[in-house]
């Protein structure tokens, strides 16, 4: 299981990303529309002044139950080994084990 501080840090990043999402998106659209290079640099400076953790690329998907950052299935929000355990225990309706 991931440390609680790492999970809290990820939650903080999610809040920052939601807070600055509209500002970041509007600035990027503005850069593509402005023809002069000096204006683009000004807008780019505004983007750089935003907090680094507000960028969506810095977010990780984490397992809902363990907080594991790797091997996550988006549909379930779980990591692979937890998903497998839950399917074997019949906690996920409709999911079947593969057999061939």
UniProtKB/Swiss-Prot annotation:
GO molecular function: rRNA binding; structural constituent of ribosome
Top-rank lineage group of the source organism: Eukaryota
GO biological process: translation
A Pfam family it matches: Ribosomal_S14
UniProt KW keywords: Chloroplast, Plastid, Ribonucleoprotein, Ribosomal protein, RNA-binding, rRNA-binding
Claim: Ligase is one of the keywords in the record: no
One Gene Ontology CC term in the entry: chloroplast
SS bond partners: none
Keyword Ribonucleoprotein among UniProt keywords: yes
Cell compartment(s), UniProt: Plastid, Chloroplast
SUPFAM superfamilies: Glucocorticoid receptor-like (DNA-binding domain)
Protein's job: Binds 16S rRNA, required for the assembly of 30S particles.
Assembly information from the UniProt record: Part of the 30S ribosomal subunit.
Family to which the UniProt record says this protein belongs: Belongs to the universal ribosomal protein uS14 family.
Protein name per its UniProtKB record: Small ribosomal subunit protein uS14c
Organism: Phaseolus vulgaris (Kidney bean)
């Amino acid at each position: 299981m991931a440390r609680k501080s790492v999970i809290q840090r990820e939650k903080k990043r999610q809040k920052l990303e939601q807070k600055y999402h509209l500002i970041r998106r509007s600035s990027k659209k503005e850069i593509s529309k402005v023809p002069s290079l000096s204006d683009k640099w000004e807008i780019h400076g505004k983007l750089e002044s935003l907090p680094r953790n507000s960028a969506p690329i810095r977010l990780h998907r984490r397992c809902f139950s363990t907080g594991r950052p790797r091997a996550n299935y988006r549909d379930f929000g779980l990591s692979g080994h937890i998903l497998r355990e839950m399917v074997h225990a019949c906690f996920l309706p409709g999911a079947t084990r593969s057999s061939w």
